[in-house]
Amino acid sequence: MNQSLLSPFGTAIERVETALISLKQGRGVLVVDDEDRENEGDLIYSAETLTNEQMALLIREGSGIVCLCLPDERVKHLALPPMVENNSSQYGTAFTVSIEAKEGVTTGVSAADRVTTIKTAIADDAQPDDLARPGHVYPLRAQPGGVMTRRGHTEGTIDLMILAGLKPAGVLCEITNPDGTMARLAEIISFGAKHDLPVLTIEDIVEYRKSLMAEAS
């Protein structure tokens, strides 16, 4: 079903290439996971190029839970422990404690404040003491190996940033419909057309990475 609805946007490889161009240009992408998994679409931006306007769109059109995807080594560097010791969530989503920048924010809730927190966390010279805990940004720890290890939006986000030549850090939020229900692929495609955002799937990223590995072998 996913692939048939997405076929007008090209092959899996072409959809990833289009997404990488969008990210390199500082724009966002929409990533849908498998229909037999969460079957949800996330709006994703590079943390490196994220703007206040983009954050406002995430908050306005999404679930409100704005997450910062980080690789394992960055999570360890920032000394961010897991949100819970025993993760019993259905898909093992690796939330850490939530964070807030210690400087440059007010309540931490506004779009500008959340962007400040994200930029603080991904700064080259970032230190654990730069961040207060808890806060209004929710870091997610990506599994090493990306989508080849776990087919989640967290890993897909990090893979896309690396493939685009950007810092391995991305911001995501699930897209919801006006009535509060989760947007599925058909609604995600309509949302993408409205906001000029390319749409791709986690499976597309898997296929793209497999093609790169095949070329290298």
Curated annotation (Swiss-Prot):
InterPro entries tied to this protein: DHBP_synth_RibB-like_a/b_dom, DHBP_synthase_RibB
Gene that encodes the chain: ribB
Pathway in which this enzyme or protein is active: Cofactor biosynthesis; riboflavin biosynthesis; 2-hydroxy-3-oxobutyl phosphate from D-ribulose 5-phosphate: step 1/1
Protein name as it appears in the record: 3,4-dihydroxy-2-butanone 4-phosphate synthase
EC number(s) recorded for this UniProt protein: 4.1.99.12
Binding site for Mg(2+) 2: E38, H153
Pfam family, one: DHBP_synthase
Xref: SUPFAM superfamilies: YrdC/RibB
Top-level EC class: lyase
Stored Gene3D superfamilies: DHBP synthase
Known function: Catalyzes the conversion of D-ribulose 5-phosphate to formate and 3,4-dihydroxy-2-butanone 4-phosphate.
Reaction(s) the record says it catalyses: D-ribulose 5-phosphate = (2S)-2-hydroxy-3-oxobutyl phosphate + formate + H(+)
Family named by the database record: Belongs to the DHBP synthase family.
UniProt: D-ribulose 5-phosphate binding residues: R37, E38, D42, R150, R151, G152, H153, T154, E174
Protein's UniProt keywords contain Manganese: yes
